[in-house]
Amino acid sequence: MHKIVQQGSKSLIESRIKRKSLLSKVVTDVSQLIPYFQNGHYVSMGGFAGTGYPKVVPIALADHVEKNGLQGKLKMNLFVGASVGPETEDRWAMLDMIDKRYPHQNGHHIRNGINSGRIRFADQHLSTFASDLLAGYYTLDKPHGSKRTMDIAIVEATEITEDGCIVPGASVGITPEILQMADKIIIEINTSLPSFKGLHDMVKIALPPFSKPYQITRVDDRIGLEAFPVDPEKIIAIVESQLPDNTSVGAPEDETSSAIANNIVQFFIHEIEQGRFPKNLLPLQSGIGSIANAVIGGLSKGPFDNLSVWTEVIQDTFLDFFDNGKLKFASATSLRFSPPGFNRLFNNWENYKSKIILRNQAISNAAELISRVGCIALNTPCEVDIYGHVNSTNTMGSKMLNGLGGSGEFLRNSRISIVHTPSTRPTKTDPHGISCIVPFASHIDHTEHDIDIIVTEQGLADIRGLAPYERAKVIIQNCAHPIYKPILMEYLETSRQICLKNHMGHEPHQLDKAFKFYTNLSEKGTMKIDKW
């Protein structure tokens, strides 16, 4: 079992609860809260990308299930802005405590549960998830209570203000929305962290027909609240936590990610020279992972100054970007730093906090704002096909990885949409067994109409303004691995010849052969086919 730190200095948690009438809500024995959770309940948690999530109560629930042999008998429908730490939702999945899960996850056991059919999961654009949740789209079949509420919301906070508002920690996600729609609320105050007051800018989302434009034109604009109001009558408990976010040190930059980053930097330089980008570029959006980290690291070393960021998640390499003076300001919904990264943040807190805003994910990922500020989107997919369709979620067309996340809203609405991936990935028997450039993507999350630039370590394909056949040639020549380049080119040219004869040559395919890479991979452990 995970060791729970239930109680620190009484004066410490009291100092974080500025509204003294709420001190009566403090609970030191979390076992008292277990009966509030019933099989089939709709439970929501704060947190985003593995930070700022509640830990003490979810861990206590898992301990209770494990100790009493309740696996499969106490199952929740779980709603989180994105992913949370493995000691919470992934352990819940291991103990068969999750029935439904929306809209994004990251963990071995929860992924296995989804792909084995044990957990009902659907990914969703993160920008619209909160409003859809408020509208009741995800509680339509709720068998008890109101069809538009959560039974319980559990959120992490770093302070409760004098007027009873919640100051979150390292992420916002859907915390404002679940505080509005929950019947009961449990607040975990993490006293191992400093108060994050002043870092957030949170708004109450209005649903149509009452929605209005978000008055943001610059990444550092503020339109909301530093702390979010909560109905004190809904609060059933306040629990002290001293557990850190369970993050890890990212994979180090390697030769492949470095080459991808360099290709992108050179493209940016070219766009500046051609007058399509200003010298300080446009606001950057970067996904999560080693390649994304390498790209941001490469930009921080590049000839760019006075940059800004409009993204979902800020990672370790952004700290280097701040420290060398090239990054002016960053807006996100989550800070996902490694433990050393968080130490850097806290040791220079006053400097960093004046350069960062954390917003609702409904704001950080809003199509309206991504388009208005003119983002440069940078995301890592599973695969890209020769016409520019992108698969970000389902390998072999069927196996869910993590979910769509925010890639859809950024790739669809940014000024420039860039996807970057290694040209190949290894299998157990072949170091180049999987080509990330394929004839026809086995699952499509982002269409050919959304993508401008494709980058691998082999090169960069600028497909803006190109017809499908032109796109395919550029993608194969510039991005495919040399092993797969002739195989893909043969498929393209043969498909074109056949389709032109039949007057269907706009975007040529041979449907009897389009997925042969995948069948060969299943049968032989490699996409290196012998012949078409």
UniProtKB/Swiss-Prot annotation:
Compartments where located: Cytoplasm
Binding site for CoA: 287-291, 402, 406
GO biological process entries: acetate metabolic process
Active site, renumbered: 312
Reaction(s) catalysed (UniProt annotation): acetyl-CoA + H2O = acetate + CoA + H(+)
Principal subcellular localization: cytoplasm
Key words, A-Z: Cytoplasm, Hydrolase
EC number(s) on file: 3.1.2.1
Organism superkingdom: Eukaryota
Cellular component annotations (GO), alphabetically ordered: mitochondrion
GO molecular function: acetate CoA-transferase activity; acetyl-CoA hydrolase activity
Function (record text): Presumably involved in regulating the intracellular acetyl-CoA pool for fatty acid and cholesterol synthesis and fatty acid oxidation.
Family: Belongs to the acetyl-CoA hydrolase/transferase family.
Designated name of the protein: Acetyl-CoA hydrolase
